[in-house]
């Protein structure tokens, strides 16, 4: 299995994503936003940061980058796509995930560890966790308030698309939502950073199982 780690001007978690992929036992390669092909890749990791300086709004300019059409193609083919923080914002901007990310209710940038709950462990991203398991991931965002209409929220609930919730909501997200998947279950976006949660020495290794779950799910289908 080989992951593409997208790199935009202003990305600052691409190395963490690369390391997470390698640590999970697969290949990874950085892919510049100006590229026009993701041929040969089995999945996409869209890292956090401040793509294009968050001009217009977070993820807006990245959403029209040349590589995005290929991200949509891989998603349509059922390949795994994970967007974290700014990556989540990009996924909502390009329509692969519903809703939007707004400014935190506090209007402050939040950077700290947060306790989260796995509320759906029947996805390609969470199947190595226990249902209801509590995990610790770092958060680092100013625009992490997940917002959606009541209609979309009911669809998310009906389809079990909500996978991760905050135990102590730090940003005002609708129903404490921290992470969701698309209806097909192969595209995932979350504001917390599992790629920064790989070593107990650094405070938490709760994120290891998420990347291992992605690899496990892919291998079950292709090996």
UniProtKB/Swiss-Prot annotation:
Pathway: Purine metabolism; IMP biosynthesis via de novo pathway; 5-amino-1-(5-phospho-D-ribosyl)imidazole from N(2)-formyl-N(1)-(5-phospho-D-ribosyl)glycinamide: step 1/2. It is found in: Cytoplasm. Its EC number is 6.3.5.3, 3.5.1.2. Gene3D superfamilies: 3.40.50.880. It catalyses: N(2)-formyl-N(1)-(5-phospho-beta-D-ribosyl)glycinamide + L-glutamine + ATP + H2O = 2-formamido-N(1)-(5-O-phospho-beta-D-ribosyl)acetamidine + L-glutamate + ADP + phosphate + H(+); L-glutamine + H2O = L-glutamate + NH4(+). It comes from the Bacteria. Residues 3-223 form the Glutamine amidotransferase type-1 domain. Transmembrane segments: none annotated. The keyword Nucleus does not apply. The active site is at 85 (nucleophile), 193, 195. One of its GO terms (molecular function) is phosphoribosylformylglycinamidine synthase activity. GO terms for biological process: 'de novo' IMP biosynthetic process. CDD domains: GATase1_FGAR_AT (cd01740). Its main location: cytoplasm. Keywords: ATP-binding, Cytoplasm, Glutamine amidotransferase, Hydrolase, Ligase, Nucleotide-binding, Purine biosynthesis. Pfam families: GATase_5. GO terms for cellular component: cytoplasm. Part of the FGAM synthase complex composed of 1 PurL, 1 PurQ and 2 PurS subunits. PANTHER family: PHOSPHORIBOSYLFORMYLGLYCINAMIDINE SYNTHASE SUBUNIT PURQ. Part of the phosphoribosylformylglycinamidine synthase complex involved in the purines biosynthetic pathway. Catalyzes the ATP-dependent conversion of formylglycinamide ribonucleotide (FGAR) and glutamine to yield formylglycinamidine ribonucleotide (FGAM) and glutamate. The FGAM synthase complex is composed of three subunits. PurQ produces an ammonia molecule by converting glutamine to glutamate. PurL transfers the ammonia molecule to FGAR to form FGAM in an ATP-dependent manner. NCBIfam families: FGAM_synth_I, PRK03619.1. This is Phosphoribosylformylglycinamidine synthase subunit PurQ. It comes from Staphylococcus aureus (strain bovine RF122 / ET3-1).
